[in-house]
Amino acid sequence: MSKTGTKITFYEDKNFQGRRYDCDCDCSDFHTYLSRCNSIRVEGGTWAVYERPDFAGYMYILPQGDYPEYQRWMGLNDRLSSCRALHLSSGGQYKIQIFEKGDFNGQMYETTEDCPSIMEQFHMREIHSCKVLDGAWIFYELPNYRGRQYLLDKKEYRKPVDWGAVSPAVQSFRRIVES
């Protein structure tokens, strides 16, 4: 475990079997150590893991816990190549403003809570811009915290490309809470 208390272990096979790769800091390319990744154990911290090297491709946020198969972290396949430890603020404050149009236009909603469905909670189809006022958040392209994930830190996002998306298809979001 690192000085910051972060550690993640990747396993080639399901249920923590086969070759493994231990990591306690950011790693831009570990696919040379493992040909595939079918299970993960996060022993400290919250991690962002990426499908491709250099923190690219699909991203998954993993808090401390066991993930015996890639479906448990909503993975699309057994390919992971890079990871980074998230350094979350310990203040415990969370606040986000979401907007129905780009550049902070249109109807605005502010919340401090997770949202499993923006359609049900805010009667919005998509999020075109947002302001993260406190905490770190994850946007999901589908309801109930499913689909592609986007990590949002404390700052303003004028359009979907600012948070790494190609479209405003965000259907749910949640706070990243350190366990």
Curated annotation (Swiss-Prot):
A single GO BP: visual perception
GO MF entry, a single one: structural constituent of eye lens
Q: Where is the Beta/gamma crystallin 'Greek key' domain?
A: 6-44, 45-87, 94-134, 135-177
Q: Positions modified as N-acetylserine?
A: S2
- Which SUPFAM superfamilies does the entry link to? gamma-Crystallin-like (SSF49695)
UniProt keyword annotations, A-Z: Acetylation, Eye lens protein, Repeat
One Pfam family, short name: Crystall
Residue ranges of the region described as N-terminal arm: 2-5
Q: Where is this region: Connecting peptide?
A: 88-93
The function of this protein is: Crystallins are the dominant structural components of the vertebrate eye lens.
Q: How does it assemble?
A: Monomer.
Task: Quote the record's domain comment.
Answer: Has a two-domain beta-structure, folded into four very similar Greek key motifs.
Entry's family note = Belongs to the beta/gamma-crystallin family.
Please report the name of this protein according to its UniProt entry: Gamma-crystallin S
Q: Which species is this record about? A: Oryctolagus cuniculus
